[in-house]
Amino acid sequence: MDVLYSLSKTLKDARDKIVEGTLYSNVSDLIQQFNQMIITMNGNEFQTGGIGNLPIRNWNFDFGLLGTTLLNLDANYVETARNTIDYFVDFVDNVCMDEMVRESQRNGIAPQSDSLRKLSGIKFKRINFDNSSEYIENWNLQNRRQRTGFTFHKPNIFPYSASFTLNRSQPAHDNLMGTMWLNAGSEIQVAGFDYSCAINAPANTQQFEHIVQLRRVLTTATITLLPDAERFSFPRVINSADGATTWYFNPVILRPNNVEVEFLLNGQIINTYQARFGTIIARNFDTIRLSFQLMRPPNMTPTVAALFPNAQPFEHHATVGLTLRIESAVCESVLADASETMLANVTSVRQEYAIPVGPVFPPGMNWTDLITNYSPSREDNLQRVFTVASIRSMLIK
């Protein structure tokens, strides 16, 4: 894997810097490195593809070295270099695709394609060994079963979940009280509602709670907490739990009271915040518990009082909500996040070449399915294919 990264890094630098008119002295070190790559690869044969619709391709390396010059690089020099670069880039691209479409239930962190296994040989270590990529660094750590650490921005840690629970219900669905939520990606939105605006509740207050368990532990997380849930701020028609009917939700938004968010690890509270909004942090956690209250306003203008009558019908429904968004965090496991395209890269290649469903990943690389059942086998394979996708993205956009 590190050899593949080094190949890609050398080729990217060569493609960017070996251009007509450049002084040879400015790129002499790069050309020496480029020639070392050619020397190491010459005389070797590889085969890629042969799975799904990914075609079999054979690769043979027999290239001349780039020479030295006291002057600027001319058109002939650059054309010779470009022919070599283009062949190598095509080779790296196909090795990456060949690796990205394979999976294994055992030792999925190790190379799975014949071409990458061959590149793992000791003789290829002479190719400008470079371990500067976060993905490569963590792949090496995971390969040795040592602790890894990925930094993510808006990590897709929450499987998609959108539903509701009713704490008070009746067949007519005209005086409901409960909670509805939408968890997806890096964000939780939860709303508590009471059609009667807590008119008969103790102290005219309804208590709500929402607990979310993560599939992986996050550490050093920067989080935004807001006293609102905008996705539940407009009228909608909702299917009943049994699917037999629908009910109408017409929210009027109040500010939540006594808001508390707890971050827990293995059942132990690590961080707690009360009535604090904006940016907060959490050291390490695998569970988030949100609790908040809906309090009937003790004093209301006639207009507000008309919204919340003391008896049915309740045409407007008192609602309070919270939004929690993980802006950045560190995780030992690889995840999809907002700043990278690894999941899309892997998925698009597998779709384009009609790769059959294997023993590890769900059909279509469905992220909600994948993260919901994030087994050690999936974790190993995902880290490997994301690492390869990061290498491919250096050359192929």
Curated annotation (Swiss-Prot):
SUPFAM superfamilies: A virus capsid protein alpha-helical domain, Viral protein domain. The keyword Zinc applies. Ca(2+) binds at N266, D286. It is found in: Virion. Residues 62-73 are annotated as: Interaction with the inner capsid protein VP2. Pfam families: Rota_Capsid_VP6 (PF00980). Keywords: Calcium, Capsid protein, Intermediate capsid protein, Metal-binding, Ubl conjugation, Virion, Zinc. Gene3D superfamilies: 2.60.120.170, Viral capsid alpha domain. One of its GO terms (biological process) is fusion of virus membrane with host plasma membrane. Transmembrane segments: none annotated. Belongs to the rotavirus VP6 family. HAMAP family: Rota_VP6, Rota_VP6_A. Homotrimer. Interacts with the inner capsid protein VP2. Interacts with the outer capsid glycoprotein VP7. Interacts with the outer capsid protein VP5*. Intermediate capsid protein that self assembles to form an icosahedral capsid with a T=13 symmetry, which consists of 230 trimers of VP6, with channels at each of its five-fold vertices. This capsid constitutes the middle concentric layer of the viral mature particle. The innermost VP2 capsid and the intermediate VP6 capsid remain intact following cell entry to protect the dsRNA from degradation and to prevent unfavorable antiviral responses in the host cell during all the replication cycle of the virus. The VP6 trimer contains a zinc ion located at the center of the molecule. The zinc ion is not essential for either trimerization or transcription activity of the DLP. Zinc-depleted VP6 has an increased sensitivity to proteases. This is Intermediate capsid protein VP6.
